[in-house]
A protein has these predicted regions:
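N-terminal assembly/interaction segments in proteins that build large macromolecular machines
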Residues: 1-265
């Protein structure tokens, strides 16, 4: 990772990158040193008034993080702490504002379907309606019906139901999807799960891992540093690369390979 290379445009032109600052010669030199061919597979750039880098695990993970505002050693140290956060917590976005409406809609759709496929997690009034329909329409086996009647007040009820009974509840939930989604209790539960997911995937919303330095989220840590330094600091972007990321590994089926070699099928 390097923050002062000018070649290429947002990772699109590797040839232009290699022609910058003697990088091509450096690759040749390093190849001769270690005896293995080195090549640039991908790259990305971040820009800002201050840029900090962090390499973890001897090169297993590399991070660049940029911010606009002031630039000094204290700010770069703070950004290095943020880079360590990125290495450890693997955020996908800088903030919620960086997620498109289509992506948010997809996340919500997945969250809804995930909830419907786990009936035990549904709000009690909705789950009761599903059980009532399954019982009234005689959709349960005699064994599951008996288990339900005996254990319906047990919080571990689902431990006594068969997989088939759970599948039946899932089918009923999916069939009533529109009504369930319109339910205020369910909608509130979905919103809560969405907020939790966004805190996991958005850097600025994540809980700051260096709680010894600041107890709060990453955005709060940056604001706290800016206040103490009397400076303006606004995170503008980051890059996180992991070793082997994006490389597809060929899966070998040795049983099939041996069968081919011996003429067996």
């Amino acid at each position: 990772l390097a923050s002062d290379l000018n070649g290429g445009a947002n990772g699109e032109d590797i040839e232009a990158l290699l022609a910058t600052n003697g990088l091509s010669d450096l690759l040749v030199e390093k190849t001769a040193t270690i005896g293995e061919k080195l090549s640039v597979r991908r790259f990305a750039k971040v820009t800002g008034d201050a840029v900090a880098s962090y390499i973890h695990g001897g090169g297993r993970i590399g991070v660049l993080v940029a911010a606009d505002g002031a630039s000094n050693d204290a700010i770069k140290e703070a950004l290095t702490n943020v880079a360590m956060q990125i290495a450890a917590m693997s955020p996908e976005y800088l903030s919620k504002d960086c997620i498109s409406d289509d992506e948010l809609a997809k996340m919500k759709s997945i969250t809804i379907d995930s909830s419907l496929n786990k009936p035990e997690s549904l709000p009690k009034p909705i789950l009761k309606n599903l059980f009532d329909k399954a019982v009234n329409d005689k959709l349960f086996s005699d064994e599951d019906l008996a288990a339900y009647e005996e254990q319906k007040n047990n919080k571990f009820l689902f431990n006594f139901l068969s997989d088939k009974a759970v599948e039946t509840l899932v089918e009923l939930a999916m069939a009533s999807k529109a009504d369930i989604v319109a339910n205020k209790i369910f909608a509130g539960a979905v919103d809560g799960r969405m907020k939790k997911q966004l805190k996991e995937v958005c850097l600025l919303e994540q809980a700051f891992v260096r709680s010894d330095l600041y107890d709060g989220d990453v955005a709060g840590y940056i604001a706290d540093v800016a206040k103490k330094l009397g400076a303006s600091i606004k995170a503008t972007g980051f890059i996180r690369y992991a070793k082997g990321e994006g490389i597809e590994k060929k899966e070998e089926n040795y049983a099939e390979e041996i069968a081919k070699m011996t003429g067996n099928k």
